[in-house]
Amino acid sequence: MQQDGQLRDGLWIKQTPSLYNKTQAANWLSRIKYPGSWSEDNVGDFEADLDNLCLLQRLQIVAFAFENTAMHYTSHHSMDISVPALYRRFVVEGKGSYCFGQNTLFLQMIRALGYRAYSGSGRINTAPADSPPNFLSFVHEVLFVQPLKGSNITYVVDASGGGSCITRPILLKNGAKVMGASPSECHALVKTGRVESSLEQIPNSKEPAGVEWRLIVTHASDSGPTSTRIMYSFIEDEFFDMDYECSNIGIYTGAWAEKESLFMNNIVCARCFWLSDEEMEAELVKNSMLETFECDVYSAGGTPRWDHSLRSRCLGRLGLYANELKRHVGTRTETLKVFHTEMERIAILREFFGIDIAQADLKHIRGRPPALELP
């Protein structure tokens, strides 16, 4: 039987060299605004522990947007997820990507800082909340990290920042839960199996074998019942660059558009932001979460004790979809902008997400599904 917090068979993750060097890792730390002054001379002193892993994840999803603009505003209409291209796009240019780019960058950077980690893959659920799941193929990337020295205790990390993204590491344990962006949101892990699976624990048990994990998000509401949704399922197998590249090609070429058309039919852009002190106090009081301060924040849904640090500060989300820009804080959503032209959209991308699309590149979106009125 699999032990709580461990990979199957008690497997250990070995120390694996990063594809980024110390200078690149130091530049990444500076770009995401990790506290301190970093260079190739001192990045080897980074303390690769669980709390710092949490801070790195949160800083990444604040610094970089979950976005697919390269699919539509470039002549090649592709999403380059190679290691050199990701460094240039994120660290040099300050732009973003979707999960393959975000988590590949994060994996290689935390390896450069001394973490033991590998990447796996998941199946996105496209069904709405409170309904049976509708899983795609393996089109999502997740990370497994063993941040404790001399231990094989394992945490799941997703630093992609899209949708109702998880915002801190979560223990690989059935029933583990963590607070989401704010106290009104919770993420949980459940180990289960698909009802259509051919596998079972023992003959004629009629119980599906628990061979996959599911990340579930729960949202409280001010005016209605709590909603629950399976975000994705994943397995513990290690996946590699070629696996992600094949899935990536299927997405940006539209080969899978009949099953998943979100990125082909839309400009998608989302990014987390830090709540102000006033917003923080309001969220903590409103959600009556003060009694959860003593629970473990990585497995029992505890609320980090509010000390004005970035580890304890809640997050909000900005989301650009269709022709609207929305700001989400806890249970509240505010429409900031409504736009109808490409000039308006690229102005919003620049102002709110730091993504600079040259006016000359607008010609590349002409005739594509998400195109708006062009100059």
Model-derived regions: residue spans:
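Active-site neighborhood of thiol-dependent amide/isopeptide-bond enzymes
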Residues: H72-E141
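Extended, charged low-complexity segments
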Residues: S261-V268, W274-P375
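Intrinsically disordered, low-structural-confidence terminal and linker regions
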Residues: M1-K14
